[in-house]
């Protein structure tokens, strides 16, 4: 077992691969580099276990970079009467805001009232929401009159379906950048003595006497294979958990009912105020969020069952039309396809429930399954509760005697970059990506290229690219433009235009040739085309 270490810079890839070759034995191996996997690895390493995380693509490549960017208790679950889930999520929201103030901040939401009893109905529910948050509440909810509602959300429609805007309710939840939180967790993992390797695919599970004893992995970028051992192997691969489970048991029944959620990015002019809008009930019974984020406006989401599991799901025309049409009903300015600067889709790992007709009604609570051979699988849940999910997973491993007992410390563990925030850190919600660097802001600004802006709409500079390459394990153009910076999700066309310069900088940092640059640009532009509406 290991003790907590001081903040550390991740080794370069060659050093990481050398570690796998030299040290094949681990206490814990976590498969999957999304919210759940990263959180689980941080929990394990911070308890002192020798921990390795492997990710087949890049950190947060899948669902974990495609959320609505909210750290929330779940107003919808309160309406369903799921008090325990809401209370847990609100508690975790408070912990995350405290432990990562450079990444999470309060955001006010306006709930418009167009019917006579909307305001008291939602107002009472939101007061319950406040009470459930207890001492970790971000700010109290309150009623708004007509004038206050429009002052908070100037682009709200004055009439919907012939009904006038009567007023509204204001409540607070948390906002964050999902991919940047994932990168912070990866850095935190190294800080507490763990190791993470992206582009490292699990190709098989090894067994001894019928018990899972390790994994075989292959370097996606270089081709080398490694046989690794562990007393505890954790499958945290989101909607893809069944593929790992079937490496142990080819007859294992699927446990995930994937649901696709689509979001659109619009210019900031569609939501010029500082508040978000929550539309409580759409035509399919879901809520619709209109949210300010990184100088733009996000609108979403949908809930469409899927049977296939693509790594890069694409938004269907029906989903796009549904969001635009619903937003048009509630906004004074009608958004069109021409206004959309990016569109993306993510797959939610909902746990199957027999007899449920719609994925919107399936549980977001996490599920932990231990196979006969000892493979621990965790799925379900959401970003807000990733820390509690991780605590439960490692607790399960301890209960099963896979690990010696050690206390969980993550409730009071500041994430990487949170300690000693500089006075000149950009304000929360100001749209500057520099805020996400926390106490490493001076390191970023010391790099060459701070004045070379590559994507004005996302604030990406050449210095950000160099920082990503040197300190954040970014290997490919996509890693930078999609997750170290959010250009692809904000302005896909501008991100595509910046790809050649990003490839050039990465080539300088990692020693690649012109052929590599050309291939990377082509690959990224193919990806980016799926984020644009033709």
Residues covered by each model-derived region:
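Extreme N-terminal leader/targeting segments of oxidoreductases
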Residues: 1-28, 43-47
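C-terminal accessory subdomains/tails of enzymes that are appended
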Residues: 16-25, 29, 57, 103, ...
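Core beta-strand elements of the Rossmann-like FAD/NAD(P) dinucleotide-binding domain
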Residues: 24-26, 222-232
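Short hydrophobic core segments
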Residues: 31, 228-238
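N-terminal Rossmann-fold NAD(P) dinucleotide-binding loop
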Residues: 37
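Glycine-rich FAD pyrophosphate-binding loop
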Residues: 45-65
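Dinucleotide-binding Rossmann-like beta1-alpha1 core, especially the glycine-rich loop
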Residues: 69-152, 288
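A conserved short coil-to-beta-strand element within the FAD-binding core of flavoproteins
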Residues: 198-213
